[in-house]
Amino acid sequence: MLPINHSEVLVSNYPLEDNSKTIYTPDKKALLQVIDFNNVIDVGILNHFINNNSLDFMEMDTTSHNFFYARKYPNDNRLVPIVKHFEKCEKIFDSVIETILQTKDLVGDKSFTFFNELVLDTLSNIESSGINTVDGMKYSQYNIYTSTGRPSNRFGGVNYAAMSKEDGTRKKIVSRFEDGKMLMFDYDAYHLRLIAKLINYNFPNNISVHEYLGKQYFGKDKLTEEEYGKSKEVSFRLLYGGIDKEFENIPFFKNVKRYIFELWANYKNDGYIESAIAGKKLYFNNVEGINPQKIFNYMIQLYETEQNMIVSEKVFEFLSRLRTRFIMYTYDSFLFDVYSPEMPLVLKKIKEILECNNDFPVRSYTGSSYDDIKLINT
């Protein structure tokens, strides 16, 4: 246990700061917010790899923890006696030691390294950036231990992964810089393009994916605005609800259907499938009603996460020399708090990084708050 700020303990220096030993922790992201250790293993990720669920430490709170937490005092952990924190830590240790011993061989696996280092470090960096609001600086908290591997993002009663455009909450998110701007990028037809990568299908570059598929849905050379909108709905339904017979002869969906059943065959034969980039083994231990379509949906959401983390790491490398901050990532979009003099460079360079040599085109939006961002031509 490493006390950070508690009246009952005085610590002048911390052991392990020389990074000479491997550190196991229930929450690597939280630890990195306080001390930037190297050689940190996240036990939550180890558990997620073998059980596909999250560790729950709520039941390990002592009576003292429950007393202070229920009253919602500011800085409540400073009020809990240090011996009670130690008691809770002992309970946590007892609960995770078996996981640590069971997964010793997994620690060196490249797929584990991808999530333990690239994914968690990247999400920790986003969290550290903070989200400036009219009420002061707020912070997000990404949960990677979901059944699909796609992070959720909520903290302090706010679901940052699903902020409404109607209730005014987005208006509160503004730049921390004087005359600063919010800048957002989102991918065009992201899942369709990710799937095309998986099945080696090339969409034409001179037409939108939704228009390209819509022409085949409706058998027309030119779509109305209404048909273009319906094209998006049809694609979504076919991808996540199953491919109807009337669309099976469309080349893209014919290949998608073949890929889905290849995934299913691999799962039935091996007992798992491997994620597209990191090669993480997905066993679906705790997934009810597993079927070919559900496996495909899980595969795509995890592929999305892996791809997003790779480009996000590159974005942080670029921003390391600038004042602009990467403050939020939500499935197919990325939000930045931009220092105005850096806007031209940031807009150009981050667009290049996200698009990956035009494989995944993005749209760009800017405004004075997250609520009033408008599409811009780039």
Listing of model-derived features with the role each one plays in the protein:
Residues F115-V119, R237-L238, F252-K254, I277, ...:
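A glycine-rich phosphate-binding loop feature that marks nucleotide/adenosyl-phosphate handling sites
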